[in-house]
């Protein structure tokens, strides 16, 4: 499966525009970390792009989230490590590899950064910076859905929180037009 095929699958299965944008943001962050670590950029990108493919089917059935995605992707013969990372992002598999950990920590972070942009008067990623993100990170009422403990597990992939947040922001800024931010 190539990226275009994956993107088409995402657009066919995710009804909400924001979910598609979330998938694009996670993909961008995953690709950025793959480049940094010298890993397969396409594989890492696919894990990010496809990780929530089943969301509309499992929104009221959380125990099957990620598992249904893996089932939906069986016919595409994706590498097992991509499928494992997808399961791992929602606690359905042990986080073993750097890709597993990256997807797990990037998932809430993309939403957190999006919230930072939307709270700025311009609503643009270009006006978000590390200082603003660090301030918002400490505010428990801000972007409640973005699990801070989960985000802080970035250290398990060998990246300190500030560097992690900045790298994700940079990745998302590169596709800001696609994200509408």
Whereabouts are the PLM-identified features?
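Acidic/His-rich, divalent-metal-binding segments that scaffold phosphate/diphosphate chemistry
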Residues: 1-60
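Amphipathic alpha-helix face/heptad-repeat signature
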Residues: 22, 102-105, 168
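Long, low-complexity, intrinsically disordered polar/charged segments
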Residues: 38-58, 159-180
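Divalent metal-dependent catalytic cores for phosphoryl transfer on phosphate-bearing substrates
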Residues: 37-142
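C-terminal binding/interaction regions
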Residues: 124-125, 130-179
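Metal-centered catalytic cores of metalloenzymes
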Residues: 4-16, 28, 93-96, 166-168, ...
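Structural signal for hydrophobic packing residues in well-ordered secondary-structure cores
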Residues: 14, 30, 34-37, 76, ...
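Predominant activation on well-ordered alpha-helical scaffold segments within soluble catalytic domains
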Residues: 7, 11, 24-27, 31, ...
């Amino acid at each position: 499966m190539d990226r275009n095929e994956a993107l088409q699958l995402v657009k066919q299965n995710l009804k909400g525009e924001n979910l598609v944008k979330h998938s694009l943001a996670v993909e961008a962050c995953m690709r950025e970390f793959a480049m940094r670590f010298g890993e397969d950029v396409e594989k890492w990108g696919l894990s990010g792009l496809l990780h929530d493919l089943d969301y509309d089917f499992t929104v009221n059935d959380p125990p099957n989230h990620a598992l249904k995605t893996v089932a939906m992707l069986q016919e595409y013969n994706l590498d097992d490590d991509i499928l494992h990372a997808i399961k791992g992002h929602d606690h359905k598999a042990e986080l073993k590899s750097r890709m597993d950990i990256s997807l797990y920590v990037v998932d809430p972070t993309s939403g957190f950064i999006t919230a930072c942009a939307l709270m700025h008067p311009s609503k643009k990623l270009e006006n978000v910076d590390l200082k603003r993100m660090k301030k918002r990170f400490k505010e428990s009422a801000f972007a409640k859905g973005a699990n801070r403990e989960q985000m802080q597990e970035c250290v398990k992939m060998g990246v300190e929180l500030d560097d992690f947040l900045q790298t994700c922001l940079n990745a998302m800024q590169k596709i800001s037009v696609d994200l509408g931010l």
